[in-house]
Amino acid sequence: MGLDSLFMNVNLPQIQAEYDRLRARLAKVGWISHGYVQDRGPGAGGPCYQWTRKVKGKTVSVALSEKQYEALKQAIENWREVQQTLQRMQELSREIIFGTLPNPPRRKRLGKKVLGLN
């Protein structure tokens, strides 16, 4: 399946509308952070919360208060949502760029897999 058949049904207004919705969603995102948090249950000194992430290939863990745990938990969820939103925005961008702008001569037609549209 080549580009001609991939993009015959490119609906520019529909794609632009979805892109605008995704952009608006990004504007509403709160705090973000990578890593993960865990509630390790009660320990000798009370509840134990932990934030773990990779820094320069090394695992780094930090003890948290309950309020820090809750805030970081939300920030990490926001980070994952941002990543998914950006991924979709990239796909839509490539769909428009390769579907509406002229291509150079090619020996083979580009497929969805090559363009990351699957």
Predicted features by range, described:
Residues M1-N118:
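A positively charged, amphipathic N-terminal helix/segment that binds anionic biomolecules
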